[in-house]
């Protein structure tokens, strides 16, 4: 299994002694939804030299194809050898995690790199999808001679295990795996020169395995390697048989110290390999090899073991494991090592201490450790002796001949062994000192290079700091200027915002103040239209008056003519105008008074026309068209002849009969004069009152028109009234509801009804009487 490295620094570190690690990694499962590829790099042979023909300082980088495509910094790498060599030995274990759904398209790339020149010496790509989960592959990787002649002789030795998040479960098996925890040798050894490695396997038939081992079957001797040539020609290279008669051998890390090796390492054997099928011939086989053989030119030629330990896995052991509480396991305190020359300080054969348990879950939570393995029930030594009886006899018979020969050569061999041991120890000390000297020289060289590089970096950093300080000062000054400019800008925007808000408030107040003014303006316009209609009504009444005057003058002019001959004799012509009706006495004085009144009436009439014309010329500049008020034909006389005559009128002041005529021409007789004078006096009084009202109304209307015109011009030129101004002296005109005649509009405006009534009561009755009299 070896030492696991989960986080590697930027520069590879020197190789550490894995035998000194007291806490090995016992995590056999990958995280959920992921898979882990564990790669143990043992060593390499015949590595190519660098481009400058110098020997490399090799180390191995392990990454996936996706990491290599994305140029990610490699996190899984081994240590660097202590000296330049073409046959390095590492013994490091690295892990690479990938997503479970990406295993079908991911490859694991092993690159041997040179530490000094960062050159790639050789690389191999192993498809993950071809690897069987939880099966230990012991690879001998090489290149095809046709592909690359420079690396054709290079060999890389590694163990690759693909781990999933769950242990596989197969039909017919109650348990998923058997875990074996090997602690170490119980007593110190006296003749062990180097650390030891252990090859552990579970064989379904120990008898057949021993026979194959005696025949020197390559699959049962040492650690069988799977040779893989790149590029890979067929996926059958990674094929694994369903059940192997030789088991699935697993290699431990080197156990030290040599006097009493200690491993504290677990081995996991799956149920699909028959490890959980306890039978009479199933056995756990542990083979011990010296780790010194790994330093030769062919490091994996583990042919002759130092000893063998065998634990029969019979059915009563299975039942014994199930009866325990907690973990389903047992511990064996003294499992002997057979067929060995190793001796303890007591002169006895050594023994090892181990523990094992059955795993039933696909994702177990508790694996064996140095602490919890001591809590397992201990296997009874008597039962162990019974199980090992036949095995001990078989090993003793085979070793009897060798023991007799050893007794003959024992005195001389002891001396030779002592001499060899002393020479070997001296050689090991010399090699250790040389290795330590090389390490110190390398450290000194690295320290000198680091010191030189650090001094150069300090000078560069000092210059960069000075430049950075200058640039920071400039940036600070620019930032201060920008801050000041932005502060002024913010102040300006705040002032502008305040002015905008004040202006908005003013406009809002002005809008609120103009709302009643707009309504008032609309009322003024309605008032102008109504005033225009009233003026049209007045003009129409003037036309009526003029027409009546013309008719009156015409009738008076006709009276100057002699009476018709068919008129009855002795009857006055003006019976209707009797003195009793007029109330004025007859005589010369009455005639003069009537003439004076009529003259005054004509003069006043002329003056009123002039005044009306003047007021008309001084009216408002804005003239709104208004439909003239209709004239009731009944008011102008029966038969409508007066209305027909009024249609021929050209307007006020344009009557054809407005000339002043002598009084004697109009009064032909005494009775007629008095009657007409009475009527004229009555009409005179009525006309005077009407003219006074018309004059007052015309003046009032002229003033209102002028004020409205001035205000309209002010509104058009922008001289609007302030919101606090108060409009006074503006009469209110009520709107007409449900009536459209001008006469009803005059009544609805609030004017006194006698403005229209005199035009009817003062003019219409007299006009009717005159027309009736003239007829």
Curated annotation (Swiss-Prot):
Assigned keywords, A-Z: Coiled coil
Alphabetical list of CDD domains matching this protein: C2
Biased composition (Polar residues): 71-84
Keyword Coiled coil in record: yes
Biased composition (Basic and acidic residues): 7-18
GO annotation, cellular component aspect: peroxisome
Regions annotated as coiled coil: 414-561, 672-715
Annotated region described as Disordered, given as residue ranges: 1-23, 68-87, 735-775
Record Pfam families: C2
Domain spans labelled C2: 12-141
Gene3D superfamilies: C2 domain
Official protein name in the record: Coiled-coil domain-containing protein 33
Organism of provenance: Rattus norvegicus (Rat)
Gene name in the database record: Ccdc33
